[in-house]
Amino acid sequence: MSHGLEPVRVPKKLKVTVQGNSMSPTFKDGDKIQFLSLGGSRLNVGDIVLVRHPFQKRLNIIKRIKEIKSRNLYFLEGDNNEIGSSSDSHSFGLVSKKNILAVTENKFKTILKNKSINKELIC
């Protein structure tokens, strides 16, 4: 018998160590980042996410949401602007929400297309 109540989903925390410099200068090799499992969280442009690589299923990568193409398709980029420094949506295309595993617990400031996204930097 249902009383209109649904179980409360408590986000699971996950600590990840950065490997590589694709998210530099925001994160550098060896930095530790706290993520929350996605659950029913809404994703926004500027969020930093932990993603299952679309072609290398055993590889999880950290990228920033650059564009939301539809409710379930995301264009992801690394923060490092050096050519060849990031494997992201420029090389593997749009990513389905089902491949996004977690989102950072805190928000980090970046500049996207000359527009500053107001995100608080908390380390």
Regions found by a protein language model. Name each.
Residues M1-C123:
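Extended hydrophobic leader/signal-anchor segments used for secretion and membrane insertion
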